[in-house]
Amino acid sequence: YRSTDPEHFDTAKEPVATANIQTGYTVVPDSLQTYRYYFLLRFNDRYDRIVGPRAERLKYIENFRDLGGYETKNGKQIRWGKIFRSGEFNSLTANSISRIKNMGIKTLIDFRDSEDIIKTSPELGFDNVINLPGSLHYRQNLLPRLEKEELRRGDANLFMQDLYVAMVSGSKRAFKSMFNQLLVEDNYPIVLSCINGKDYT
């Protein structure tokens, strides 16, 4: 079964596809490309599992991911369609804007610093845009060396290691504020965003 809402599937209708479990796959036609779909897999009319595509193909947006579906230590599952991570929302195509709006995302939590931030397009229709800039002091030691072309082999690896340590130690306030926002039910769905969608997020 297919639905744009991962918590509501119309199982009274015919499923969009069926398959023998031994086949291992089935094909679902994608006729409406402006919507994100979730799928209810029903095994032998007894066992259900909700799944969805982890990565969303959005032109000019890096690393857009749905964080739903991961299992917790107590055997539960993070709900699909509630928390996303992403790169920055700049230079969007009309199709990408439509897809994002159709996901119903209410809150953008933006970890970019004022040095990086470009105002997010109002066309996306977020109710809340919350800027929680992370620490950028790790750049201070690197930029002068880049300007003088003094980088040596292995410096990039060391820089990335220092970067992640700096993010944890220097961005505690930003991450604390993020978790406080995650506690507000009216903020959902939420997207966590930074420049590339893979460091702070």
Enumerate the predicted regions with their spans.
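Cys-dependent protein tyrosine phosphatase-like superfamily
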Residues: 1-191
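A phosphate-binding catalytic loop at a beta-strand-loop-alpha-helix junction
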Residues: 188-201
